[in-house]
Amino acid sequence: MAIGTPAHEFRELNEEELVNRLNEAKEELFNLRFQLATGQLTNNRRLRTVKRDIARIYTVIRERELGLSVVPGAEA
């Protein structure tokens, strides 16, 4: 079963929301790596999930730059 946020949910967000989600995910990844280094991390799988979410967000942003995907609410 897939864990994390599916790409279609990211595609429904506008540019500002995507950037906010990206910043939150990067901050969470930083905190998880810090916990791993100090031996406090209990869920190692979360690292992988957050990294994949970050990659999905970057993919959606790049699709929009290339015109492969449309921004929701934007008039064509």
From Swiss-Prot:
It holds the Pfam family Ribosomal_L29. Keywords: Ribonucleoprotein, Ribosomal protein. CDD domains: Ribosomal_L29_HIP (cd00427). GO terms for cellular component: cytosolic large ribosomal subunit. GO terms for molecular function: structural constituent of ribosome. GO terms for biological process: translation. It comes from the Bacteria. InterPro entries: Ribosomal_protein_uL29, Ribosomal_uL29, Ribosomal_uL29_CS, Ribosomal_uL29_sf. PANTHER family: 60S RIBOSOMAL PROTEIN L35/50S RIBOSOMAL PROTEIN L29, LARGE RIBOSOMAL SUBUNIT PROTEIN UL29C. Belongs to the universal ribosomal protein uL29 family. This is Large ribosomal subunit protein uL29. It comes from Corynebacterium efficiens (strain DSM 44549 / YS-314 / AJ 12310 / JCM 11189 / NBRC 100395). The lineage of its organism: Bacteria, Bacillati, Actinomycetota, Actinomycetes, Mycobacteriales.
